A protein has these predicted regions:
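Conserved lysine of the Walker
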Residues: 17
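NTP-dependent small-molecule kinase module
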Residues: 1-3, 23, 27, 95, ...
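Hydrophobic positions on the alpha1 helix immediately C-terminal to the Walker A/P-loop
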Residues: 20
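Hydrophobic anchor at the beta1->P-loop junction of P-loop NTPases
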Residues: 9
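ATP-dependent small-molecule kinase phosphotransfer cores
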Residues: 34-93, 118, 127, 131
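A glycine- and Lys/Arg-enriched "phosphate-lid" helix/loop adjacent to the NTP-binding pocket
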Residues: 96-139
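P-loop (Walker A) phosphate-binding loop of NTP-binding proteins
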Residues: 12
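Short glycine-rich anion-binding loops that position phosphate/pyrophosphate groups of nucleotides
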Residues: 82-85, 105-107, 154
């Protein structure tokens, strides 16, 4: 297997990176790697705890290292945290990869996220915080994206179907 991801998923919280990533990897019979999980495994802490105890800058440094390592060694589907694109070095590293920007409209994202307390940047007014993060990150997602897909009104299966039709040099499905 290649040591370059077949697809790198980016997008805001609630866009489906984790769920779509798992379904896409299963469909293509390749491994899924999630850099948020890599950071949690490395530190033994949750992302939320890292934000509270060490701050966002510390987390972003660990995240950047996790992304770099995964881009160099993972040959499956790679899911990045929503803020991974904030670092210029990460955006530069993504330049040679097939990057899928999974997008979601604010109402759909809020519906998906309201019950998730493990997202430290969305505590409080979920709709307002999401809209604020989305405005700041949208140009960065656009900068790195090979394709853009709005998941707001699509099922996981529909997203996976569309991605399978568009991913270049993907493994043959069985």
């Amino acid at each position: 297997m290649s040591h370059k991801p077949v697809a790198v998923l980016v997008g805001p919280p609630g866009s489906g990176k984790t769920t779509v990533g798992a379904a896409l990897a299963e469909r293509l019979r390749i491994p899924l790697r999630d850099t948020d999980q890599d950071v949690e495994a490395l530190t033994g802490s949750t992302i939320a705890d890292l934000f509270v105890e060490r701050g966002e800058d510390y987390f972003r440094e660990l995240e950047s290292e996790a992304v770099r390592a995964a881009l160099d060694s993972h040959g499956g589907v790679l899911s990045l945290g929503g803020g991974a694109v904030l670092r210029p070095e990460t955006r530069k590293a993504l330049g040679t990869h097939y990057v899928v920007w999974l997008d979601v409209a604010v109402p759909s994202a809020v519906k998906r996220l309201e019950m998730n307390v493990a997202r430290p940047l969305l505590l409080g007014n979920v709709r307002g915080r999401f809209a604020e993060l989305d405005r700041a990150r949208r140009p960065l997602y656009a900068e790195v994206a090979s394709i853009h897909m709005d998941t707001s009104e699509l099922s996981v299966e529909e997203v996976v179907e569309k991605l399978c039709a568009q991913i270049p040099s993907r493994p043959k499905e069985s």
